[in-house]
C-alpha cells in the first residue's frame, strides 16, 4: 500500500491517504487492497466482492467510488454517475475527504455490503446454470 501511495503526486497522495483513513473508520473489517491502480475495499479476498474504491486521478482529484451507489440514499447529492449501479464522488481536497456526508455514504454501503454481494453471487450462479 505504501509503495502505491508514495508513487502519487503530493496533493493527490494527501487526499488518498485521508480517504483511506475515512474508509477504514467507516468499514470495520473491510479488506483493503490495490487493484487496477485503485485502493479497493471488499467483504472478502476476491476483488469481485468489492464494495468501494479510491481511484487517484492525474488531474488532481480522487474518485471515491461505490459499486452499488445507485441505491444509496444521498441527501447531500454527492454521488455522480448514471450507470445501473456505480456512482462516485470527486474529491478535490483533504477537507472534502473529511465531509461527514461522505462518511455516512461509506458506512451505509458497508452496512448493506453482505446483502448486496450475496445478491450478485446469486445472479452469477443463476447465469452459470
Locations of regions flagged by a protein language model:
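Charge-dense, helix-prone N-terminal extensions
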Residues: 1-129
Amino acid at each position: 500500500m505504501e509503495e502505491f501511495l508514495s508513487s502519487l503526486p503530493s496533493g493527490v497522495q494527501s487526499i488518498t491517504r485521508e480517504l483511506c483513513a475515512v474508509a477504514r473508520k467507516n468499514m470495520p473489517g473491510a479488506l483493503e487492497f490495490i487493484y487496477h491502480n485503485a485502493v479497493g475495499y471488499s467483504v472478502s479476498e476476491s476483488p469481485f466482492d468489492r464494495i468501494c474504491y479510491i481511484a487517484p486521478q492525474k488531474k488532481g482529484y480522487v474518485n471515491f467510488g461505490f459499486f452499488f451507489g445507485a441505491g444509496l440514499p444521498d441527501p447531500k447529492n454527492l454521488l455522480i454517475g448514471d450507470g445501473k449501479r456505480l456512482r462516485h464522488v470527486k474529491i478535490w481536497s483533504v477537507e472534502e475527504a473529511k465531509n461527514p456526508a461522505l462518511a455516512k455514504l461509506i458506512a451505509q454501503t458497508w452496512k448493506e455490503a453482505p446483502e448486496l454481494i450475496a445478491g450478485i453471487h446469486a445472479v452469477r450462479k443463476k447465469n452459470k446454470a
